Amino acid sequence: MLLENFRPQSRLVTKTTRMDRAKFPVIDAHNHLGEAFGGGWDKKPLNQLIDLLDEAGVVHYVDLDGGWGEDILHAHLKYFKEKAPERFRIFGGVDWRKWESMGAGFPDWAAGRLKAQKESGAQGLKIWKPFGLHVRDHEGQLVKVDDARLSPIWEMAGELGMPVMIHVADPVAFFDPIDETNERWEEIGRNPDWAFTSPPFPPFMDILNGLGSLCPPSPFYNVHWRARGMLCREPGLGRSDAGRMSELLHRHLRAAR
């Protein structure tokens, strides 16, 4: 049997406490409604989702899928926000692909599009992981997270009162060499596009330190976070506890011991 086919079932017997509903009203501040992330709620009856949220005690739901493009943003605003405006908050995004054609005027153009998204109903800005890893400017240069040219976007978010959910980097092992010493070897083998070995990608800490030096006027929430030092240094930076299950299970149990 190949290691990749190994699916062990734990024989450890433990007490099971089933929690079907939260004790307090829940705000799900980081989630995805679209099919790309496995939910597919944009293809199902909305009442089915509302019933599920009611059952779990989720009173408010933040959908970040609009960050993938304005077509998705408008579709989700129409399908979810218009029908249940008090339940859903939909975030917009930046179309980095336009930088090549817009040239040096891209940051101002993107700030203008963010304002238009706000007017359409977007209530926040989602920045996806390609920022800092793949996004390039009109000259083909990799754009750093703290690139000063992007100030118009962050300033517009602050002016509009739009929080920014920003996902940069990934688990640190994804940036290490993919060899027998990498603790995520099996996971990366199943998902090779999760490998960001430096070089050619920027070092893990360069990306996170760039985020810490942004000092934006709008609240930033560091998604899939690295916390303590950055939170102390940056009063405008918050954190989202969203995490990969493999990270939570093995690392926090070790820390507890």
Each model region followed by its residue ranges:
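H/E-rich (His + Asp/Glu) clusters that bind or coordinate divalent metals
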Residues: 3, 43-44, 50, 203-210, ...
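Histidine/acidic-residue-rich catalytic or RNA/ligand-binding cores of hydrolases
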Residues: 37-41, 73-76, 176-183, 230-240
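Active-site neighborhood of phospho(di)ester-bond hydrolases with catalytic His/Asp-centered motifs
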Residues: 27-29, 62-65, 91-93, 126, ...
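An N-terminally biased module of ancient metal coordination in phosphate/nucleic-acid-related enzymes
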Residues: 1-83
